[in-house]
């Protein structure tokens, strides 16, 4: 016997699917939308209660969508299947935010870079370095994580950075990394890495356009600061 509360067990006028069909998805709350995805609750909580408590317990959708599968499955009522559903939804959301017509994303300002990577990087618990490879029209053609861990100039080697750009026929690059503290203020090492990569780029003929440091919903551009 299945003891899990399903959406169909709710009164018809309270079922989020019925409300979505009748009134449109935009009228549903975050909890209702999540309930539509997860579908079933537990023997002690119906799906609406579970969805609401899940969002509250993790600190909101931003935090929910940055949980690992291990963190999600520690939450009461969330098994591997529901954790996988949440992670898939999170990834789709991130990809949609970075999608533009024709899959082309043109960089005109540091804000464009922030909009592209912020959702993926702002709540990371470790430092991660991304490289964005651009063509001659400043359209992003490739994005890759090249390093995870504490960044310093002895570890981040220009060869690893520019090798990707050369393989992908890049005209220029932008690097991005996050500060897990949430404060994007550049460290001395951040500045040293930036200057080193800028000089190497000049020699190779692939310009480092910017180094963006991501914090919690804020960023710093080395170009805007005048570092490069």
UniProtKB/Swiss-Prot annotation:
SUPFAM superfamilies: JAB1/MPN domain, RuvA domain 2-like. Zn(2+) binds at residues 177, 179, 190. Belongs to the UPF0758 family. Residues 106-228 form the MPN domain. Keywords: Hydrolase, Metal-binding, Metalloprotease, Protease, Zinc. It comes from the Bacteria. GO terms for biological process: proteolysis. The keyword Zinc applies. This is UPF0758 protein CLD_1541. Signal peptide: none annotated. The keyword Acyltransferase does not apply. A motif (JAMM motif) lies at residues 177-190. One of its GO terms (molecular function) is metallopeptidase activity. CDD domains: MPN_DUF2466. NCBIfam families: PRK00024.1, radc.
